[in-house]
Amino acid sequence: GRYLEKIKRIVEPLKNKEGFNLVSVEPDGDYNRTVVTLLGDPKSIIEALIPFVGKVEEEIDMNVQSGEHPRMGAVDVIPFIPIEGATMEDCVAYAEEVGERINTEFSIPIFLYAEAARQKRRVKLPTIRKGEFEGMKEKIKEDKWAPDFGKAEIHPTFGVIGVGARNPL
C-alpha cells in the first residue's frame, strides 16, 4: 500500500492478459496493503497468479513490512468467489489448484480457508492469521497448523498465503 512504484511493478503480470480483467488495484497506506481484484476465466487467472506471486516474492520482504491490518504473507489471501455461473465447488477446486501450484513453484506454505478449508479451525481467516507473520514461524510447527500445501516452515521473506473459496463480502 505505500510504495506506488513497487505496486506498479508487482501488478504488471496481471495487465492486458487474455481471459480476465484487472478490475482494480486499491492501495491503502495505513494498512500498507493493496487489494487487487481480477474478474474472468478462472484458468486464465490461475495462470497469471503464478508470475504475479513470483513478482511479489522479488519485491516484498515481510521481515521489514508493517501496517495496521493483520497479515501473514506478502500475498495475504487469494479468495475465489463464485459469480457468473461458477459454483462454490468450482471455487474450492480453483483454490486447491492455485494453492498447490504456488507451493510447488515457490515453496510458500498454503492454508486453505473458508469453504475450501479442510479443517474446521481453518474456516475463519482471522483464526489462521492469529499471530501474524511474526508468530507464524512457530505456529506452523504445531501439528494442528501444518499447512495444506507445503512444509511446516514459513517462506523466510514471503510468509504464507491463505487461499480460499467464499461468497462476496
For each of these PLM feature ranges, what is it?
Residues 1-169:
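Long, contiguous binding/interaction regions
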